[in-house]
Amino acid sequence: MQFSKMHGLGNDFMVVDAVTQNVFFSPELIRRLADRHLGVGFDQLLVVEPPYDPELDFHYRIFNADGSEVAQCGNGARCFARFVRLKGLTNKRDIRVSTANGRMVLTVTDDDLVRVNMGEPNFEPSAVPFRANKAEKTYIMRAAEQTILCGVVSMGNPHCVIQVDDVDTAAVETLGPVLESHERFPERANIGFMQVVKREHIRLRVFERGAGETQACGSGACAAVAVGIQQGLLAEEVRVELPGGRLDIAWKGPGHPLYMTGPAVHVYDGFIHL
């Protein structure tokens, strides 16, 4: 099987063309491939499939390193767009794809960045899903013998965002896994630790569902900005500084889609016998 290794700000992917190759990935195989000592090593596996709708260009599938399939990955979406153009699967700059959660438009810009229409953030608890009686801007949770204030949103996948004074000293390693599997998140969640530098700039670390802390999480950056705007903390255009680098997020508010812009890097091509 041929594959490419790619990354978006250090969030790394194994990307496989299932348009011209006949492939099947079991959870066991994905876990073996994800092993950084015995396999290829990656945060997520991205699979390019033929479209299910003639109006679309491709179907986009995402699997975490633990073998679970998820509906959204923003950094992966940028790498997906770069991959299908590099491999000659399309020459379009606006690439329309379906996911398990709906549809997305991926745009390769003139300066070789990728701009992703991530859709409108959904704050309804049932959409996340999150166990709550009604939608709130801020929720109170108990975890690890602490009282935690957080915002909750779906970006096609579940996110919990906590504001911290300094991301460098945030309890990502201890609080992240506890909140990820908290009983109020029946499908688990991605946990973002957000430091507001100013209204146009945040710093962010994300403990990803099924992957642990990564160098960057695109949907996590989108979620943090959406929650920050909803809570009145942030402007409509925000620079997000992650351990792996910078993303630019823009959202005009309810009724509008949120846009993420950032790089996608091809590292190498490989071949593996399954």
UniProtKB/Swiss-Prot annotation:
The record marks H159, E208 as: Could be important to modulate the pK values of the two catalytic cysteine residues. GO terms for cellular component: cytosol. The keyword Transmembrane helix does not apply. Substrate binds at N11, Q44, N64, G74, N75, N157, N190, E208, R209, G218, S219. InterPro entries: DAP_epimerase_AS, DAP_epimerase_DapF. Keywords: Amino-acid biosynthesis, Cytoplasm, Isomerase, Lysine biosynthesis. It is found in: Cytoplasm. The active site is at C73, C217. Pathway: Amino-acid biosynthesis; L-lysine biosynthesis via DAP pathway; DL-2,6-diaminopimelate from LL-2,6-diaminopimelate: step 1/1. It catalyses: (2S,6S)-2,6-diaminopimelate = meso-2,6-diaminopimelate. It is an enzyme of class 5 (isomerase). The keyword Amino-acid biosynthesis applies. PROSITE patterns: DAP_EPIMERASE. Catalyzes the stereoinversion of LL-2,6-diaminopimelate (L,L-DAP) to meso-diaminopimelate (meso-DAP), a precursor of L-lysine and an essential component of the bacterial peptidoglycan. Homodimer. This is Diaminopimelate epimerase. It comes from Escherichia coli O127:H6 (strain E2348/69 / EPEC). The lineage of its organism: Bacteria, Pseudomonadati, Pseudomonadota, Gammaproteobacteria, Enterobacterales. The gene is dapF.
